[in-house]
Amino acid sequence: MVDKSCLCNCNIFLIVLFISLCLLFGIVKCDEFLTESTVEFSNSGSLTEILSSEQYVQKFVCNDNGLIQLRLYMATFSRKNRSHLYVSLKDENYDEIKSWDIDASLLKDNAYHTFALDRRIRDSKDKTYFLCIKSDAETGQGVTVYYNDDENDLGLSLNGEKLDKQLCYQLVYKKTLHNSMGGGLKLQFLMSALLMIALFAVVYFGRDWSIEKKFLTIWTMLGLMYLLTLPLFRAPDEIAHFMRAYEVSQLDLLSELEESSGIGGSMLPLEGVDFFALKSWLSFWGNHKTIVLSENQVFKHFTNTAVYAPVSYLPQAFGMIILRAFTKNIAVISYGGRVMNWFAITILMYFAIKVIPFGKEILAMIALVPMNVHESVTLAPDGLVVALSMLMLALVLHFRYARQDILKPWEVCSLYITAWAIGMLKIVYLPFGLLYCLIPKERFGGIKKKRRHIFAMAFVAVASNLLWLSLCTDFLRIEATDASAQLSYSLHHLGTFMVVMARTFFSDLDIWATRMIGIDLAELNIRTVGFLIFAYLFMLVFRYIENDRHSSDKTDRVVNGICVLILVSIVLLIAASLYLQFTPVYNNTIVGIQGRYFIALLLPLYFAINKPSRLMVDREQNDISMREFGLIVCSNVCACIALFFSCM
């Protein structure tokens, strides 16, 4: 038996470790945000080697406060020079601020060399400074500096004589956090910091809570944290998602096709709206009040989201309708859509983890991957797909293993709605409807009633999707693609298509796996902490295989088989749909597959390789440990830190 005090000390150590990681990462990202360099000058050539009889002086004026470093673009003539370079920085009164004695043999050829000050100059803005360069080199042992001569009177002199040149230098400024943030950003920063503290407090003090309570608390706090750190329209295609959601909020369920361009879109009150002014926090707080709905409606293109059925945007549209009644501010309306989408996903997730009879810990771990929480607070429907797929599987397992009586009419109705909705959200997830084959016939009142309901559900789901596809086929136009030619080629060269798919998987599977967890967020251009993402992935893999050690019975093999069929079907549909619609004809790889498309497949994957009957027996023993919840929270907090400082 492990001593309780030892276990407690270990848990405290882990919490302190995770908090320290978050703080250190926050310091690193904050330092990157506060450090700013001037642009590099293009080099026009290099000076002659700097000899003992020469002194170059570069005059410059700082355009910001906080000068902390200078960088010179230097050359060594591809040799080791036995000399010293003497560099000094002087103020406008020619008083020395700092001097450097550089061993020329240590300089790197054709590279910037950094000269760091002992402390930042707080009031350097608009002040004049002089950079003096001397050497003790004899001929053949000197180094040099590159120069730029694009303009006249550029401040460089040699032994007091002006040259129409300037050195290729960079100035590095270190701003202060206080001066770099306005009131709104400071409030966001403070609230995010408090949420981080609260999250780790829940991990430690809530260790004896039920898994449902822990999940809901951590999910809610993380959702708020992502809302505070991810600016509007920074998720993939979020501007297009906003336009489609706004169109649905106007009760325009089907987009239009612009005759002149053949591109899908709609008439929206967005004349002159600059969405990009809201995509960074500094710009957001300076511009959000002036970006409002226009009086005139203009045609806006969003053909890639015009194909989405209205059900994909029902929560977002509802939030927009409510906020639009009070304001025309686009930022406020957008956040109304974001929050309502997140709220709907939260409800579905909570019901899923509440009703699932076993595997609650796996469901929570999957739901809390940084990419899924990130997508759930945006206007995109990806988080809704994951939540609904989890609810479907949770209901099926509940009806199969926990229920003994016949389903009530409203429960049967919920099965119809979820089977219809999952396909309408994204047609490639239609095979999730196969889960309903796992519900015992006794729950329907007999085999005939079960078959009748299963066929009816399949008909409703498939027919609805085919009808919608027929209505929006014209919107499926991507530049440099030809779906009909691609389909014809694939049917006549099925083996080639399989090779293309295999090549794509071998080439990109590692990228999909790490992006599925959340190594790259926002528009997939902001890197989080890689080793935490790999640790999260390893944690999931370990959880997936640790229970796979018992013999299975026939009922287990049925569940495993259906889940495998769902996985294979959806993967093939994702590959085929993107090959037809987004990939240029005859391309040797499939274009457009994203890691987040596979998040919804993680839960059925777990039940495809584990034994449900054994999981049901061991369900009371399965929980998420403090170290696992600590890793989950640490990964997400670091992701939010990266988003906040990288989106300035």
Predicted features and spans:
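Perimembrane helix-loop-helix junctions
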Residues: 395-406, 430-462
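Short acidic/glycine- and proline-prone juxtamembrane loop motifs at membrane-interface regions
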Residues: 378-385
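Transmembrane-helix signature of polytopic, membrane-embedded enzymes
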Residues: 210-213, 328-331, 350-370
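Transmembrane-helix motifs of polytopic, lipid-linked glycan transferases
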Residues: 199-202, 335-358
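Beta-sheet-rich sandwich/jelly-roll-like modules and their strand-loop junctions
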Residues: 7, 17-93, 107-112, 116-128, ...
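Membrane-interface alpha helices of multi-pass inner-membrane proteins
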Residues: 374, 410-427, 432-438
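Interfacial juxtamembrane loops and adjacent helix segments
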Residues: 252-336
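Membrane-lumen/periplasm interface segments of multi-pass, membrane-embedded glycan/lipid transferases
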Residues: 178-185, 291-300, 465-550
